[in-house]
From Swiss-Prot:
Iminosuccinate binds at H63, S81, Y152, V153, N154, S169, H237, P238, E239, T254. Catalyzes the condensation of iminoaspartate with dihydroxyacetone phosphate to form quinolinate. One of its GO terms (cellular component) is cytosol. This is Quinolinate synthase. It comes from Xylella fastidiosa (strain 9a5c).
Amino acid sequence: MEEAHNMREIRLREIVVNHAVLSSCLDKCGDCFASEAARIKFDNDIEAIFELKRKRNAVILAHNYQTPEIFHGVADIVGDSLALARKAIDVDADVIVLAGVHFMAETAKLLNPEKTVLIPDMEAGCSLAESITPEDVALLRQTYPGIPIVTYVNTSAAVKAASDICCTSGNAKKVVEALGVPKVLMIPDEYLARNVAKETEVQIISWHGHCEVHELFSASDILQLRENHPGVTVLAHPECPPDVVAAADFAGSTAAMSDYVTTKQPKRVVLLTECSMSDNIAVHHPDVEFISSCNLCPHMKRITLANIRTALEENRHEVTVDAKIAAPARRAVERMLAI
């Protein structure tokens, strides 16, 4: 255990020291080394988390938007929403700590009803999840009878339960077309729905939810980036406005962005998404210049080493889903995973 801790600590220090591109979005990790006392606390948190994972037979699932000290330092499984949902099914542990936002923890619980699922901060929410309620879904069914409802995973379990099938930004087009119908409702992300609609012949009716991180990007941002950084490759998340996606060189989920950088190896690239995405993959691509142009998600940043440690120590913030909601919500998620 000590050797594993030391290796991860060394790796993390290398990230901080050798990759200046991380500095703009590594405020917490930078602060860790601002004083001797902070460094000691940082080291103690890392070591304690590894020991607690061992004692409790726990695993940490971390989203790509988590800070590098979590993503590279303590996480056992990392990925985008789709990857975490798929991998959660096969987790061999008694306890799952979801280093992400609440809807992700609910999804992990839906797929692992017998396991203890913890979220380090119960207030880690999501603007998309908060943009729609089960009552809204019921009204949509009345307004558009017989039309399937495809629900983005960035929603509460209660909204999933009122839906027909889920999707992620990585499989939305595939899910929509797999239904074999001419028209669907896609909720709650308006921009994701509009971007998918451009790629398929299926007619898509959208809701009015937006991601507070991705809605801030604009096509003028891309023009400025290209002017300031000639030859830059622009990757955009499909939660961005359609004119941003149209102006980008590539649009895809965070997993697709990572794969693009790995396979294409652009000389310089900018990721129009949450800041930690670039931070976390830059370490694996020292020959790629990552241009900083990102927005922080305040909800993702509520997760810290300290509250991960507390969650494991005190079994704090256990996630539960009412049985009447869990069964239909699980079906909607499982239908997606089966495609």
